[in-house]
Each structure stands twice: as C-alpha cells, then as structure tokens.
Amino acid sequence: MAKEELLELDGIVDEVLPDSKYRVTLENGVVVGAYASGRMRKNHIRILAGDRVTLELSVYDLTKGRINFRHKDANSPRPPRTGQPRR
C-alpha cells in the first residue's frame, strides 16, 4: 500500500482492550479500533487511556487504524513507578 493511500488523523485513546487493541475517538468524533505499530511495540512505548495519539487509517477501511505516535502531554495520566526495575 502506498503512503498516499493512508490518512493521518489525531485522536484520544478511550479504552485499552485485550490483545494490544485500543478504542480511539478521532478529532471529528468518530470512534475507531486501533492497534500499536510494530515500531511502538519494539520500543516498549506504553499507550494508556487518555493519551493523545496519531493514527494512520486506510481509505479502504475507515473503522480500523494503526497508532504510530503518542503525543507527550503534561496532563496525560501516568501510572506511578512501583515494583522491580526493568532489566
């Protein structure tokens, strides 16, 4: 699929679903299902409810998207760090 065939839209994560899926509300109010891109999974970028994200949507199926960027907001909810440090 060529890059010209993808739509880039911003949205807010409403809900974290099982199996690394997310429910995202776009700026225009449309709710879509999304998953994290491979680069985000590889770099262990955590996506939580309330995060502002950028999605890529195919023009052929506007109900599914791929999250390719999580915006850093000062008011974004972050869990406290507890437990063992990562190795």
Curated annotation (Swiss-Prot):
This is Translation initiation factor IF-1 1. The keyword RNA-binding applies. The keyword DNA damage does not apply. One of the essential components for the initiation of protein synthesis. Stabilizes the binding of IF-2 and IF-3 on the 30S subunit to which N-formylmethionyl-tRNA(fMet) subsequently binds. Helps modulate mRNA selection, yielding the 30S pre-initiation complex (PIC). Upon addition of the 50S ribosomal subunit IF-1, IF-2 and IF-3 are released leaving the mature 70S translation initiation complex. GO terms for cellular component: cytosol. InterPro entries: NA-bd_OB-fold, RNA-binding_domain_S1_IF1, TIF_IF1. Residues 68-87 are annotated as: Disordered. Belongs to the IF-1 family. It is found in: Cytoplasm. Coiled coil: none annotated. Gene3D superfamilies: Nucleic acid-binding proteins (2.40.50.140). GO terms for molecular function: ribosome binding; rRNA binding; translation initiation factor activity. It comes from Burkholderia lata (strain ATCC 17760 / DSM 23089 / LMG 22485 / NCIMB 9086 / R18194 / 383). Keywords: Cytoplasm, Initiation factor, Protein biosynthesis, RNA-binding, rRNA-binding. Component of the 30S ribosomal translation pre-initiation complex which assembles on the 30S ribosome in the order IF-2 and IF-3, IF-1 and N-formylmethionyl-tRNA(fMet); mRNA recruitment can occur at any time during PIC assembly. It comes from the Bacteria. Signal peptide: none annotated. PANTHER family: TRANSLATION INITIATION FACTOR IF-1, CHLOROPLASTIC. Residues 77-87 have a biased composition (Pro residues). Residues 1-72 form the S1-like domain. Pfam families: eIF-1a.
